[in-house]
């Protein structure tokens, strides 16, 4: 449960928000690392296929975490007063909104790309994900290119987000980073 401390103390987010934030961060970075790693491997090799399979399975996990995160944020998560005002608040709100939008788009593109390949895909080998929409195989390259572009955009925005957190912590010393590191 989140609390708002008085005076110079910081606001602390609820545990669920913190868990969803860091789980999302680790999944996004991990998915990106898997994709970038397999791009250096020859097509059709067992290692490349394993990395792609892991990317798909963790991508499905990411989709579930993202949906749960949005539900949590809308229904249960504690809203705190903004840590900044003026242009910092506008920038923070804009980057957060854009990250959410891009993550939703990336998830949709991931499904579309797999469906365009016309091959079944599984969640850690436990079950196959059904094809819900028939996608023309010819659109695969276009969708794959968008998936790659959105991935890089998310990584760049996430890096800016992390740098902003460090700026708040070391320059402004306003407790913003500590709000996402601990819950009381």
What are these regions (language model features)?
Residues 28-39:
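Alpha-helical transmembrane segments of multi-pass membrane proteins
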Residues 51-65, 150, 155:
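Alpha-helical transmembrane segments
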Residues 111-132:
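Juxtamembrane non-transmembrane "cap" segments at the membrane-aqueous interface
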Residues 68-88:
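Membrane-helix interface/capping segments
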Residues 95-115:
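Hydrophobic alpha-helical membrane-insertion segments
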Residues 39-49:
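Membrane-interface helix termini and inter-helical loops of multi-pass transporters
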Residues 1-12:
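Single conserved hydrophobic/aromatic residue that forms the stacking wall/gate
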Residues 136-157:
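Hydrophobic alpha-helical transmembrane segments
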């Amino acid at each position: 449960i989140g609390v708002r401390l008085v005076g110079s103390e910081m606001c602390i987010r609820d545990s669920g928000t913190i868990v969803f934030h860091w789980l999302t961060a680790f999944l996004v970075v991990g998915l990106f690392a898997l994709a970038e790693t397999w791009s250096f491997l020859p097509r059709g090799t067992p290692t490349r296929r394993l990395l792609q399979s892991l990317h798909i399975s963790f991508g499905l996990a990411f989709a579930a975490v993202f949906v749960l995160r949005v539900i949590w944020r809308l229904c249960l998560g504690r809203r705190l007063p903004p840590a900044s005002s003026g242009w910092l608040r506008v920038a923070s709100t804009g980057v957060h909104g854009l990250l959410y939008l891009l993550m939703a788009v990336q998830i949709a593109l991931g499904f579309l790309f797999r469906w365009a390949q016309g091959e079944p895909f599984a969640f850690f080998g436990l079950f196959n994900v059904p094809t819900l929409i028939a996608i023309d195989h010819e659109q695969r390259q276009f969708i794959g290119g968008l998936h790659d572009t959105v991935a890089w955009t998310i990584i760049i925005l996430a890096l800016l987000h992390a740098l902003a957190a460090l700026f708040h912590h070391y320059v402004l010393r306003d407790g913003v980073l500590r709000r996402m590191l601990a819950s009381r």
